[in-house]
Amino acid sequence: MSYIPYVVEQTGRGERSYDIYSRLLKDRIIMLSGEVNDQVASSIVAQLLFLEAQDPDKDIYFYINSPGGVITSGLSMFDTMNYIKPDIVTICIGQAASMGAFLLASGTKGKRYALPHARIMIHQPSGGAQGQSTDIQIQAQEIQRLKDTLNEIMAEKTGKTAKRIEKDTERDNFMSAKEAVEYGLIDKVLTKSFT
């Protein structure tokens, strides 16, 4: 069981208690902590849509500390980030690996950050298949299609060619925050809060 802190605020009508994530959401801050899966993606997508409905002209701050996870779950967040009007400020705290790195790079250009000791890792998609040989072939083709899609998007986000992305993601490719700036995954290393 994970522990979720609560904060208490004084209002004109007394005290109000929030879990920390609800309180952060009030300030347009969304947290991705842990593995990317359908349940996490649904929660993040709902928060993005809620914040756009509240104010489509204000930035949304998306903090990422994730080892990655399910590609299609990550793509649902990516598509929503691009679908809504507000700029998405991405900030890596801890690590952004695999789909976490993809989401980090998918923030609004000029507003993609990492803290000084954050680690970013990119690599090719992985997956497994079982069943009849034709089913395995279908799954392999789907993984290849997803790989090509991710490489094209990462190329656009980093300014690299899709061929270069394919080469650089052949194996796990770890970077410091500074190296991620040089690679084009993020725009700046943050040393002080800007909110």
Curated annotation (Swiss-Prot):
Signal peptide: none
Catalytic activity: Hydrolysis of proteins to small peptides in the presence of ATP and magnesium. alpha-casein is the usual test substrate. In the absence of ATP, only oligopeptides shorter than five residues are hydrolyzed (such as succinyl-Leu-Tyr-|-NHMec, and Leu-Tyr-Leu-|-Tyr-Trp, in which cleavage of the -Tyr-|-Leu- and -Tyr-|-Trp bonds also occurs)
The protein's name in its UniProt record: ATP-dependent Clp protease proteolytic subunit
Gene3D superfamilies xref list: 2-enoyl-CoA Hydratase, Chain A, domain 1
Gene that produces this protein: clpP
Organism from which the protein derives: Sulfurovum sp. (strain NBC37-1)
An example molecular function term from Gene Ontology annotations: ATP-dependent peptidase activity
UniProt enzyme class: hydrolase
Family listed: Belongs to the peptidase S14 family.
Enzyme active site: S98, H123
Organism classification: Bacteria, Pseudomonadati, Campylobacterota, Epsilonproteobacteria, Campylobacterales
Location within or outside the cell: Cytoplasm
Pfam families: CLP_protease
SUPFAM superfamilies: ClpP/crotonase
Self-association and partners: Fourteen ClpP subunits assemble into 2 heptameric rings which stack back to back to give a disk-like structure with a central cavity, resembling the structure of eukaryotic proteasomes.
GO cellular component, one term: cytoplasm
